[in-house]
Regions:
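Short, flexible, mixed-charge glycine/proline-rich loop motifs
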Residues: 43-51, 61-65
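Short, well-ordered, mixed-charge alpha-helical segments that flank or form enzyme active sites
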Residues: 27-31, 54-64
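N-terminal Rossmann-like or analogous alpha/beta NTP/dinucleotide-binding catalytic cores
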Residues: 1-47
Length: 175
């Protein structure tokens, strides 16, 4: 795996860190399941059927434009049930937060880029994959036939390392 290569290189370069965490660690899996359950209980996750083009090699759905680019191989049309996060419900809140906190996104041209993106309706975010198609990942706490999609659980890793659910004082000092 890659992780030992990084940690070995950091030692040679005299680079120190407070914590090194991987998304495969039990402490991370615990936090992901906890957050997923909270978000589900809040009504921000729902099950729906999705149909689209799927790149088997990339393990993700792609747009028609991406399919036409020739950059993807082994593309198939796929229709399946998955769980979705209601991202669209938070669009106005995101815009307000960014505008109320001028330094939240740096540099300024990136902030403007994000605000421009948020002018178009946000799509809800698919956060799962059926175990029948993807046998690795963190199991959803509310449906054992599904795992969390890696790009959703990877973001949670930041707050796992910051002590969410394990070190309240550390978490409050960092977050």
């Amino acid at each position: 795996t890659m992780a030992p290569r990084f940690t070995s290189l950091w030692e040679k370069l005299h680079i120190a860190n407070d914590d090194f965490i991987r998304t495969t660690e039990d402490r991370h899996k615990k936090v992901v399941k906890e957050i997923l359950q909270i978000v589900m209980n809040n009504g921000d996750i729902y099950e729906a059927e999705y149909e689209g083009l799927y790149s088997v090699s990339e393990e993700r759905f792609i747009t028609e434009k991406e399919a036409d680019s020739g950059a993807f191989r082994d593309i198939k049309k796929l229709k399946e049930k998955n769980y979705f996060f209601k991202m669209s419900a938070y669009q106005e809140q995101l815009i307000k937060h960014i505008n109320s906190n001028p330094n939240f996104i740096q540099p300024n041209h990136r902030k403007n880029e994000i605000l421009g993106f948020l002018k178009k309706p946000l799509n809800d975010l698919c956060i799962s994959r059926p175990k029948s198609r993807l046998n690795w990942g963190i199991e959803l706490p509310f449906d054992d036939k599904y795992v969390t999609y890696v790009w959703f659980d990877a973001l949670i890793n930041y707050i796992t390392a910051a002590g969410y659910s394990s070190d309240k004082n550390l978490f409050q000092s960092l977050w």
